[in-house]
A protein has these predicted regions:
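ATP-binding glycine-rich loop module of kinase domains
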Residues: 3-63, 68-69
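C-terminal lobe substrate-recognition/regulatory segment of protein kinase catalytic domains
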Residues: 234-292
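Conserved catalytic-loop aspartate of Hanks-type protein kinases
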Residues: 192
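Activation segment/activation loop of eukaryotic-type protein kinase catalytic domains
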Residues: 131-175
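Conserved structural core of kinase catalytic domains
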Residues: 62-106
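Terminal C-lobe "cap" of eukaryotic-type protein kinase domains
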Residues: 296-301, 307-317
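Conserved alphaE helix
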Residues: 87-145, 288
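Activation segment
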Residues: 184-189
Length: 317
């Protein structure tokens, strides 16, 4: 990709600058910050299937305030141009662990509204995680959140006739997947709801319970990320209901779930305090209720996004 890109839609010239995300296999697929006049943008060369998907999405969600869609493109080069954001939820909390609770909830509220917008046209995101939530600050010293949007639709999927998504292998980041998502079977809107609530747990201070920092140790002991995440989640949010097995309805997937359920049950027998019911008490009853609803292991009983947004937790300071 050359150092400048001309947008097909606007005719603007974007001058490529710093690398935001380096692709070691192919430098032309790296993500760059770019300038056009005094404005900052993100320039990203993408695969043809994702380019075509993005064109479809931007047509469906024109003018969205909560979804980060591209604002310009270059078809010949396969380049998309996005608005530039100051940070992500992941980086914001890592860099400022003392970010006030009300600002964290503001980001989460905006994210829930983004999910609602996707669902209104029967799309699921599949990869909801803190680094796909982009944030702008107001520029002052108070670290007020000016805006937050949901981005990165690489694996977004349009549900046809309410059918669950089934893939050849699990997709998205293992740390933020729903239990059914770990098996690559039975992924629906309810799967996104589960992932969103994991993001909420992270945002309100529970990151150490969710993040995998020891990938090399897992590999050394022959443990896959899926196994580790499932055993943790079943420990926190179990016991595993029969409804999850019915949703997955796949021999290999159900075997994985049962094996991890046995490990989780043994853990809880000796350490009952690892259940969400115990360690979430400090959140207060309203927050505890909101999170427990969305992280239920039964996909059929997770709340809709409208129910999520109507929960009293959002009105708490």
């Amino acid at each position: 990709m050359v150092s400048t890109v001309v947008g097909d839609c606007s005719g603007r010239v974007y001058v490529r600058g710093n690398v935001l995300q380096h692709n070691h296999a192919d430098d032309t697929l790296s993500i760059f910050k770019a300038k056009s006049g005094t404005e900052s943008f993100v320039v990203k060369r993408v695969s043809r299937p994702f380019y075509d998907l993005s064109i479809r999405l931007v047509a469906e969600f024109t003018g969205s305030r909560r979804l980060r869609m591209h604002v310009d493109c270059n078809q010949d080069e396969g380049v998309l141009v996005y608005p530039y954001f100051d940070s992500t939820l992941l980086a914001l909390i890592q860099n400022d662990p003392d970010l006030v609770h009300t600002q964290r909830k503001k980001i989460l509220r905006y994210t829930a509204e983004a999910i609602q917008e996707l669902y209104s046209k029967n799309w699921i995101h599949i990869d909801i995680k803190p680094d796909n939530i982009l944030v702008n600050l107001d520029g002052g010293d108070t670290k007020e959140i000016a805006n937050a949007v949901l981005g990165d639709f690489n694996i977004a999927y349009h549900l046809e006739d309410g059918k669950a998504l089934r893939t050849r292998h699990a997709i998205s980041n293992a740390m933020w997947r729903s239990p059914e998502g770990q098996t690559a079977v039975g992924v629906t809107k309810a799967s996104d709801i589960y992932s969103f609530r994991l993001v909420c747990i992270y945002a309100i201070g529970g990151g150490e319970l969710l993040l995998l920092e020891d990938y090399q140790d897992l590999v050394r002991f022959g443990i896959t990320p899926e196994q580790e995440v499932l055993s943790r989640h079943f420990t926190y949010f179990g016991p595993v209901p029969d409804a999850l097995y019915r949703r997955v309805d796949d021999e290999v997937g159900c075997a994985l779930l049962r094996d991890m359920s046995k490990i989780a049950d043994a853990t809880v027998e000796s350490q009952p305090e690892r259940r969400f019911l115990y360690w979430s008490k400090e959140l207060g009853p309203v927050a505890q209720d909101a999170i427990s609803q969305m992280t239920t292991l039964d996909p059929t009983t997770r709340p809709t996004i409208e129910q999520v947004l109507a929960h009293p937790w959002w009105q708490e300071d």
